[in-house]
């Protein structure tokens, strides 16, 4: 026992240090195990909690899912709002111009400011109606009345008295404003329509409340039973009645053609009886409004005039235009007098307006593909062909010509055609020619019936009647195709009687034919060698100058004592026989078109043959190689360009008083420096560089030397024209 007892302490003593270490390590291990066991305990605890929740029926899980769904919905809503505000920020210029992205409130504030600026300040009325800021109330009223083609009136609902009426009442009903203002609307209506007006002016409830007449379908529609609300915002009214037509005169010039025809084309109820007023059908549309309007204070006199009315009818009255005019004179006025056609450069119809049926009698399909020259008079075909060639060269400018057109009834109608070309804006090539063809006779009749107010004076009254058509101006030009033909001169061969004047005024004697009728040997072969071309005869309504520059200079020469030259085409001497005045008198000048170009035919290289023998009806030799253009009964000697040059009066060696080329334009010295280079390139066969001075006093006033050159005054004003 003793041996065993000490052995135990000895072992324990021998293992003292190691045992201490072991015990300490055991303690550490126990602490570590406790730390590690804690998570296990927690996990178990969590698991036990979950299990306990499951055991409780899953109420907490539903709450958690509900919270998650609500958060997702809110997140989506915030994302959408952010996207819309970002898009709004991009649309507002003030927001997009900022350096940094503004917050949401700033974006909304700037958007509201931008919308107000677009809408305009102060344009919104109390009832929410909108009016553009750039229009005044008066301008807006006129625009509305013009668009509605009617008149505006305001009527008191209780008394039926007219409180206001616009000035457009006069062209619609031929009554003045004073006839309506202050009067009863019942007096202006047909007696049988009084009950209808009383029903429309009534503001009380009725069985027909909310019923509207639809004019398009002819049915009665019901708008609903919101009478109290509609009365506050304005109850709509629409009805048809018969109104009395007055006798106040209407000035046609103050109205356009459409309004004038519509006022003439009233839907009358048959011819009025003697002593009875005439009534027309008027469609009235408007609203019942409170009177006086909110915020408007009336004077005592105005308050007495409305007789205590609380409501008024604000309406627009428009004429019911019938499809069958009742007026007999409308049958002639409504007939079309013109139609539009489209042609190619050769004159073929590519499009025809439907009004051609009433104007010339043809259906559009009958004219398509045909050449307009085929329907023109044989004597006018060359004139029309030249007009098409000229309008092509004018490139967009309007050219007017009058010719005879073969109608469907095989009658010749005088047609005035105003044509211009349409160019491709990219290639600048001519696509087609657009013509407006007007029947002159129908146009004059319609202008007479309209009292001169139709067409806004497009065709002036200065044009002559059909049997007295004046001779159109035709010129003679040389081989120089770089200059435009003169439209103010006439070729002598165009007159059937060579004793007539070379230049005729615009009011020539009636019955003068434009082309020779008999003994016309002007063949195609001769035409091919003829270097003289005829320009397009313009319409008589072209603007005409009062005096030409040639007349002014001729008058100055007579005052200075310059002797007239008998060989000059501008002066009449003993060798020329004029039909009207005595020998030695000056012929009248043609004041029609392009007067500044009248001096072009005066140059010696373009000289016409001189007139020899007052009654011999013979012409001198032409100083060119052109084929002669015969006239009726005229004898022509053989052409010798140089042998008979002395008979022309323009020979530079034998003539003392001569007209230089472009003497008429000598009053424009500032242009001569610009034209020298161009005119030196124009080589004429008989150019005379040194000619005597004609108007020394004129040149002295213009500070010009006495010796000048023809080429100084060659001014190509108009584009070139080649036959």
UniProtKB/Swiss-Prot annotation:
Keywords: Activator, DNA-binding, Nucleus, Repeat, Repressor, Transcription, Transcription regulation. It is found in: Nucleus. Residues 65-118 form the bHLH domain. The keyword Transcription applies. Residues 557-570 have a biased composition (Polar residues). Residues 137-208, 325-395 form the PAS domain. Residues 1-23, 487-509, 557-592, 670-694 are annotated as: Disordered. PROSITE patterns: BHLH, PAS. Residues 670-680 have a biased composition (Low complexity). One of its GO terms (molecular function) is DNA-binding transcription factor activity. The keyword Cell membrane does not apply. GO terms for cellular component: cytoplasm; nuclear aryl hydrocarbon receptor complex; nucleus; transcription regulator complex. GO terms for biological process: intracellular receptor signaling pathway; negative regulation of DNA-templated transcription; negative regulation of signal transduction; positive regulation of DNA-templated transcription; positive regulation of signal transduction; positive regulation of transcription by RNA polymerase II; regulation of DNA-templated transcription. Transmembrane segments: none annotated. Residues 400-443 form the PAC domain. In day 23 embryos, expressed at highest levels in brain, spinal cord and epithelial cells of developing gill. Expressed at higher levels throughout all tissues in day 27 and 35 sac fry, predominantly in brain and spinal cord. In the adult, isoform 1 is widely expressed (at protein level) and is detected in liver, gill, gonad, brain, kidney, heart, spleen and muscle. Isoform 2 is expressed (at protein level) only in gills with highest expression in the epithelial cells surrounding the gill lamellae. Gene3D superfamilies: Helix-loop-helix DNA-binding domain, PAS domain. Efficient DNA-binding requires dimerization with another bHLH protein. Heterodimer with the aryl hydrocarbon receptor (AHR). The C-terminal region of isoform 1 contains a transactivation domain. The Pro/Ser/Thr-rich region in the C-terminus of isoform 2 inhibits DNA-binding of ARNT-AHR dimers. This is Aryl hydrocarbon receptor nuclear translocator. The gene is arnt.
